[in-house]
Amino acid sequence: MASLIYRQLLTNSYTVELSDEIQEIGSTKTQDVTVNPGPFAQTNYAPVNWGPGETNDSTTVEPVLDGPYQPTTFNPPVSYWMLLAPTNAGVVVEGTNNTNRWLATILIEPNVQQVERTYTLFGQQVQVTVSNNSQTKWKFVDLSKQTQDGNYSQHGSLLSTPKLYGVMKHGGKIYTYNGETPNATTDYYSTTNFDTVNMTAYCDFYIIPLAQEAKCTKYINNGLPPIQNTRNIVPVSIVSRNIVYTRAQPNQDIVVSKTSLWKEMQYNRDIVIRFKFANSIIKSGGLGYKWSEVSFKPANYQYTYTRDGEEVTAHTTCSVNGINNFNYNGGSLPTDFVISKYEVIKENSFVYIDYWDDSQAFRNMVNVRSLAADLNSVMCTGGDYSFALPLGHYPVMTGGAVSLHSAGVTLSTQFTDFVSLNSLRFRFRLSVEEPPFSILRTRVSGLYGLPAARPNNSQEYYEIAGRFSLISLVPSNDDYQTPIINSVTVRQDLERQLGELRDEFNNLSQQIAMSQLIDLALLPLDMFSMFSGIKSTIDAAKSMATNVMKRFKKSSLANSVSTLTDSLSDAASSISRNASVRSVSSTASAWTEVSNITSDINVTTSSISTQTSTISRRLRLKEMATQTDGMNFDDISAAVLKTKIDKSTQLNTNTLPEIVTEASEKFIPNRAYRVIKDDEVLEASTDGKYFAYKVETFEEIPFDVQKFADLVTDSPVISAIIDFKTLKNLNDNYGISRQQALNLLRSDPRVLREFINQDNPIIRNRIESLIMQCRL
């Protein structure tokens, strides 16, 4: 039978070389996450950013934490936070525009009763009444006046454990922090000529750009990173910030060495990376309340931008690795909301962005050394996605955020629709950010990460500015170009190829002749005969079979076999421990997984439907293990697969393993299985439908789920190629003998061929419907 190919793949797919395993582990990483919501389900993350520090050769990348600097008087740049780190009580900072705003901040130690103290503010002795009732936290207080001879008033106190304070000039205002750590927030004072306000810092301080305000707030609330609190960190003068040094231009080509035929060129480029995520949201069959998958997909994006007066055309491909698989199950009823799998990227994930532009740097990117890059970080936030239910309020997946931080660069190759491009792959590590994501109107809430439902949040693209530098060996004659070959890391976008191949496979279903299909389904297809139609040589067929086996090892069918083997082992050990007791939980459960529910005889109709559906999903494996003379669904699916492989014009060695594995999982999703006991037939399908009837008259009788579970264990399981409704329709319209009925019930291929050769419309329609279910 044609289903021999699946049994061979299951048998042989576990022999894999160690080098292949290592390569696969390095290229693919998926993590299943089980979430148990509770008061301690989520925790905050430490505000530590272990980075390389400032890189002075970039015109676009600036450090997150610049400093520390020594106490001084200067005019801070606009839109930059001064993060002040005092060590003792007293005046921390003061600033004025010399017209209508004099603002100073003082620090008061813990546990200070109301007392009058003298402070020197703007060169004058001032008496101020202060207090701090906190036993552990230090208190920052703003002192402000609007005229030179006016009196100071106190504003915006901040109770702080880390003993850090922030001041910034921005948008006609002076911003500070108030409240109590770890929940301090920003506040502001309006002022004129804000850009001319000079600041005098009486303690060490850092400078943080406004774009990194979230980091500044984390430092205020939680303290500086541990590396900043060591004796190796020495404050320097603020004038060091103004040291003039030579920076590379946005576009720079430098000849490193040159011979008659070859030369080494160093390319320095400022780049703007724009990218977006793509996703796939797949709805399951049924009543419309269930989704099978919400996943990330590779996304291509082409754009133009201006670099040093030159318009640059760029192309990016964004992909993700280290996916976390979540799921939500609202219940077992057909109208309960279910998401079988939705993907989330978190701190254990990586984002890869392959970048190419039309500059000279990418013309000869084959032999490359000294590759380096530095990029800014970017925040990616999730939007709202509504799951449209037929009735009731829509569940909405909302929120979620991650920030991307540069973690390295390698060479790669992008495969677009028209051309292959040697490019750079920028790797980004992730950290989770606020807000968390949730699914409204469900129990899912307060989870961190970026889900795949709407990762772009209505934005056309995300943008990162940065710079890269590399040295490339190129021909001395600039008119020559080295050919494009696979670089260090090859990124082949199989999604596009597989999408086109799936469409071709689905269209080929209409070109299959049923009589030939039945003959092909009866042939013992092995791996060589299955794949030999693609390549003529034996070695090529062997290589393809090996690749298919490697991929097939990870299929859901192979995983089901592994699970079943464990169940049978448990059942065997249970029986050996107590041979005198025949337990449904130790025998039938290995095939049916209904050990806990078959004991209740008074079950409802919906409960029986659930049980029979659960049993039917496992009967494919039982049928494989106890092969009969009848034809089964896998014979038909394998024959259809063989026919389509022979007819396909787009199949290759890269896509074949994916297609064969998908076919084993997705061909003929709606299957029915039957067991025969004397003159009774019990039949159940994977969609929960069940029938019990007599062979002689096709008269329906009550369905006994306990009897069905027992027969499944002890009797052969038969694929209902011609299901009960088709049989009853055939008998009512044409009339069939008892022997013909038994042969059709046993899925006898000879009888099937006879009906097809007689052009029986009922049988032909049934076989055609099975062929049309062979879709990817």
UniProtKB/Swiss-Prot annotation:
Region (Hydrophobic), start-end ranges: 389-409
Keyword Nucleotide-binding recorded: no
Segments for region (Spike foot): 510-776
GO biological process terms, semicolon-separated: permeabilization of host organelle membrane involved in viral entry into host cell; virion attachment to host cell
Site (Binding to sialic acid): 101, 190
Annotated spans, Spike body and stalk (antigen domain): 248-479
Other facts noted in the record for this chain: In group A rotaviruses, VP4 defines the P serotype.
Protein name, as recorded: Outer capsid protein VP4
Lineage: Viruses, Riboviria, Orthornavirae, Duplornaviricota, Resentoviricetes
